[in-house]
């Protein structure tokens, strides 16, 4: 078989093989969702999040009746390919929200000068995070009391940054954190602080879900969902607890262990131009 013949066969077979794999993947998720004891998992959908976080977040906001607001996301870059094009708050930007992104790596977006989204490049640690937060809020003309959603995912010192946010007086309606699913409840684990830490792929990173549940309880937050890949946990302020009476009370019925890298692309690949479009501030027509 010549090289050209092999290439022709490959080009014809690859789409069919990929489609078959996608169908198997969807069946895998459908089965997991059908077995979930948490009704919020049934709302999970991927649009611009890494996994099913978009759908879960939108359902939470629908329940607490927040249509417009402000977000604050720390850790929006996922490596070489997804620097600012795959994270938890893009969907909120597209719904008309305003927000702030912070990451130690530049994003692959060319944001307009007048933007609903402001990005700040900063590698955060306990010593610089408060100043970075306050500078970002001031430049974005947003008060910390106006932040509705916070998301933290930095693959390392997540707890120490999360702790700083809450101690600084942030009280978002919904707080999303990446947890370390390697440690099931009731295991308590929190990575020792290292201001220069960079994740190298091992399980020494972040916190166990039980550690986070115990911590957030001190600040008036309740765990309502873990996404189905065992990546992110959603905490909602107790002032909204009546909206989540159908959510399991036992952490073991909410926890998901790691089941990473299964979600397939939904629709066409993400374009930076699309996100830049939604970041533009458009003047409303005069009445």
Map each language-model feature to its residues:
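Membrane-proximal basic amphipathic "stem/tether" segments
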Residues: 1-44, 274-287
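Intrinsically disordered, low-complexity regulatory regions of eukaryotic regulatory proteins
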Residues: 3, 20, 51-52, 71, ...
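Polar/charged alpha-helical tracts
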Residues: 4, 8-12, 131-139, 167, ...
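Amphipathic repeat-derived elements
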Residues: 15-33, 119-157, 198-206
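Short, functional N-terminal and low-complexity linear motifs
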Residues: 20-28, 101, 178-182
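Short, hydrophobic/amphipathic alpha-helical patches that form generic packing surfaces
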Residues: 22-24, 59, 213-215
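SAM cofactor-binding core of SAM-dependent methyltransferases
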Residues: 41-136, 140, 145-152, 181-184
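Conserved acidic-Pro-Pro-aromatic motif
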Residues: 70, 89, 145-150, 156-286
């Amino acid at each position: 078989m010549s090289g050209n013949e092999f290439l022709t066969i490959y080009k014809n077979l690859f789409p069919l093989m990929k489609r078959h794999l996608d169908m198997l993947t969807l069946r895998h998720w459908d089965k997991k969702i059908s077995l979930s004891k948490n009704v919020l998992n049934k709302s999970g959908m991927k649009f611009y999040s890494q996994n099913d976080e978009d759908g879960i977040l939108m359902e939470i906001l629908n329940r607490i009746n927040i249509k417009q607001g402000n977000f604050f996301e720390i850790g929006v870059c996922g490596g070489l390919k997804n620097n600012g094009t795959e994270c938890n708050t893009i969907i909120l930007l597209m719904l008309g929200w305003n927000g702030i992104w912070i990451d130690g790596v530049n994003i692959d977006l060319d944001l307009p000068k007048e933007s609903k989204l402001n990005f700040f490049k900063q590698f955060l640690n306990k010593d610089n995070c408060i100043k970075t937060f306050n500078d970002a809020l001031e430049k974005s003309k947003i008060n910390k009391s106006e932040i509705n959603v916070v998301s933290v995912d930095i693959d390392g010192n997540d707890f120490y940054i999360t702790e700083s946010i809450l101690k600084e007086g942030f009280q978002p309606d919904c707080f999303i954190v990446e947890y370390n699913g390697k440690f099931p409840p009731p295991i308590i684990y929190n990575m020792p602080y290292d201001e220069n830490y960079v994740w190298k792929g091992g399980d020494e990173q972040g916190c166990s879900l039980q550690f986070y549940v115990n911590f957030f309880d001190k600040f008036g937050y309740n765990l309502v969902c873990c996404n189905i890949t065992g990546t992110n946990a959603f905490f909602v302020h107790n002032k909204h607890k009546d909206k989540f009476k159908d959510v399991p009370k036992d952490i073991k019925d909410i926890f998901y262990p790691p089941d990473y890298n299964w979600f397939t692309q939904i629709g066409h690949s993400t374009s930076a131009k699309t996100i830049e479009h939604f970041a533009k501030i458009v003047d409303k027509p005069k009445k």
